[in-house]
């Protein structure tokens, strides 16, 4: 993992999320719900929800990083647990701030498989070492 960290100002964040929403819209993807990965994905998911007109937002609290450059061996879901109700036909957009190693996104995608019709991922930043290649960056 790179030691270099980028500070994202509010202005840069706003631009990044608008561009991310435009990528999703231009692709023609119309998610039925957005799943935020807490904590970094909370604001991303909320902003995408407004921009894309998606009112169904879910939150999944996954712990992988325990500090700067410190992480667990594997991601762990923390309570309260996500409970999808009658979502077999739903298209879901998973939102997070960054795909660093990609392990969190891989965990969340695996969790969603079989519970929804389609899963796509959207992040503000994707690192080169990420094992997951996100649909929208």
Please report, for each region that a protein language model flagged, where it lies by residue.
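PRPP-associated nucleotide enzymes
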Residues: 1-137
